[in-house]
Amino acid sequence: MGENGAGKTTLMRVLTTVLKQTEGLVSLDGILYNEGNYEKIQKKIGYLPQEIDLYPNLTVKECLVYMGGLSGVSTNDLKQRITYYLEKTSLTEHQNKKMRQLSGGMKRRVGLIQALLNNPDFLIIDEPTTGLDPEERIRIRNLLVDFSKDRTVLFSTHVVEDLAATCTQLAIMKKGNFLYSGSVSGLLENAKGCVWNCTVQNAEEARLLEANYSISSKQYVENGIHMKVLSKGKPNEKCVPDNDITLEDAYIYLTNS
């Protein structure tokens, strides 16, 4: 996870062999990333980039047959996997539609299927829910959880809700570096005692807090302006500890510390 430009997509392109690392070592299951090993690595990986064009004039099924063939999947395995994943993604009834006729969410689901056709050990997905409506976002997140039962799933996002709903482990990037890598619970623990509820009476008091602290939420209420203030120490006498820390609170606290 990280803001736009943090380096998430670049890292994924290195992991999928689209880009070559300029320094350091990368390995997958003990296999070092170098040109002699790229073919072995690619067979272990399924990849869905943030933007993918899947042949608008082909039907869903035709597109998947073609993509599976490029991955070297046998005809029998390919037929079984396409049938299975079309059902798993609720696309069976749409398999004879042209790709250009699909919604954005449906196209992402087809993209997920193509990434799974070679039965990868490692599924890498860049921004899986970008541009999707809330219902499709939930559907994609649930699919990722299902797929993670028997493989490693790595996805990038700047949407905190995606992580909160799907992950137990996460890494946070900023300007090409890792600020954190570990459990979700560990990140929440890091912000413990540093999230405060504060209700101020007017906009001037609110501006003063915003000038000196990170604010994770702000809401106008009947008796003033309610704010969640992130600080190691108590910001002012009106602030009380917030013990209901969200992943968004913890993320903002870490990235702005």
Regions found by a protein language model. Give the residues of each.
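ABC transporter nucleotide-binding domain
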Residues: 139-228
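Conserved ABC ATPase "signature" region
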Residues: 65, 69, 76-94
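Helix-to-loop junction immediately C-terminal to a conserved catalytic motif
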Residues: 16
